[in-house]
Amino acid sequence: MRFYRTYLLVAGAFCSLCTLAVIFNCGWDDSPPATPSAINGGGSNAPLISSPTNLPETFLYISILTSPNETERRQNVRDTWFRLSTKGPSVFIAKFAVGTMGLAAEDRRLLAEENEKFGDLALLDRHEESYERLAKKTLACFVHAFANFKFKFFLKTDIDSFVRITPLIINLKQIQDPMLYWGFLDGRAKPFRKGKWKEPEWNLCDRYLPYQLGGGYVLSYELIRFLAINAQLFRHYRNEDVSVGAWIGGLDVKYVHDPRFDTEWRSRGCNNEYLITHKHTEQEMQEMFENLKKTGKLCAKEFQKHPSYVYDFSKAPSECCTRVNGSNIP
């Protein structure tokens, strides 16, 4: 019995010493904190993601994808739909996203001068512009926004899209969801195997996963956070909108299909209910702006070039989207 008691005392003392050693080594770690590049896998190509604290705050961050040489198109946007709202940066902040990697010194100088004058460029110094890298650029926009701004929602749109910013924000406040993915949803598209939009890397299934068309779509902050933090893990498909749909396809996403997003590869026409309308010339953008200022309506006359649809969530994605000629669907 005496031996047993001695054994227990020795074993207890040994365990106590081990516990103290573990607490000392783990609880008072004086090593430096992990850097953003370490968090994201390290390496010179790792996107730097800072902790989103003490950042400028806004309700809606807008990223407009544009090329370095599209100076006139950027000015066209400033002169048209940027002027539709007098709300300050607490409501929305809009930035033109431009890749600067590989640019000539003169091009960089011109962009720097433009940004000094207007303060509305997001210069992506780790991105080299090309159509083949559009998905990568979109992801870089997510990373840049997450690292530099605090927002509730993110709108990705194109330089040839016209945005009715006030009704867009009003509607967004009505439907806001922490996992929102809002736009014109497609679930039955088959991958292109040749041509400009071919997808040689797509092998998940014989159709694309449901995705919002690329002329303009809204993502919640939580989805942007997920995309930014995991940016290095994603495969980049040729089409940026297809890529986004695939990247978040396994999450508990709140999909909202809205025919008021005229955001397909070609415009469906003109409808006064449109919140965003895509594929327009500078002249068309100016005309829509003048119409809104004079009459409060987007269109001088409504018309439909191509039929729209309402997404049927009760059916399989491949059967989701039946276009109806002559309907009142925007």
Swiss-Prot record:
It is a single-pass type II membrane protein. It catalyses: 3-O-(beta-D-galactosyl-(1->4)-beta-D-xylosyl)-L-seryl-[protein] + UDP-alpha-D-galactose = 3-O-(beta-D-galactosyl-(1->3)-beta-D-galactosyl-(1->4)-beta-D-xylosyl)-L-seryl-[protein] + UDP + H(+). Its cofactor is Mn(2+). Keywords: Glycoprotein, Glycosyltransferase, Golgi apparatus, Manganese, Membrane, Signal-anchor, Transferase, Transmembrane, Transmembrane helix. It is an enzyme of class 2 (transferase). GO terms for cellular component: Golgi apparatus; Golgi membrane. Residues 25-330 are lumenal. It comes from the Eukaryota. It is found in: Golgi apparatus membrane. Disruption phenotype: Worms are infertile because of the failure of the progeny of homozygous mutants to initiate cytokinesis and because of the failure to form an extracellular space between the egg and the eggshell. Its EC number is 2.4.1.134. Glycans are attached at residues 69, 325. Pfam families: Galactosyl_T. Beta-1,3-galactosyltransferase that transfers galactose from UDP-galactose to substrates with a terminal beta-linked galactose residue. Required for vulval morphogenesis and zygotic cytokinesis, suggesting that glycosaminoglycans play a central role in vulval morphogenesis. This is Beta-1,3-galactosyltransferase sqv-2. It comes from Caenorhabditis elegans. The gene is sqv-2.
